[in-house]
């Protein structure tokens, strides 16, 4: 996989008003801080965990199995920026299937939420959306 270079980030920040970088938990806080220094203020932490199979081919894990890995990552990134009094948007995704999942991500420092797999069980969606609306009113 090719590495994202600073000039790639600068190009997108200059060209587009809203740039959101999707960051898996394998990326270091130093790399995230570097992206912030280049103008990125919105981070999607992350609805996929990159993996490699026995052939060396890449794929991603998503869904419920991610929450245990993404939740501490959200907390770490949120704390990093909070300690520096630096406002960022943190979009949490991965394993959001019920209101408690949204609350957990909110308490970890998420400002927004990415929903995907939950739409395969549409009867669960209203409760989750109601929780997001409630949190956003606070």
For the regions a language model picked out, list residue spans one by one:
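Glycine- and other small-residue-rich loops at beta-strand/loop junctions that grip anionic moieties
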Residues: 2, 21-24, 62-66, 91-95, ...
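Glycine-rich phosphate-binding active-site loops on the catalytic face of alpha/beta enzymes
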Residues: 42-51, 96, 102-129
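Catalytic cores of alpha/beta
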Residues: 26-39, 79-84, 90-113
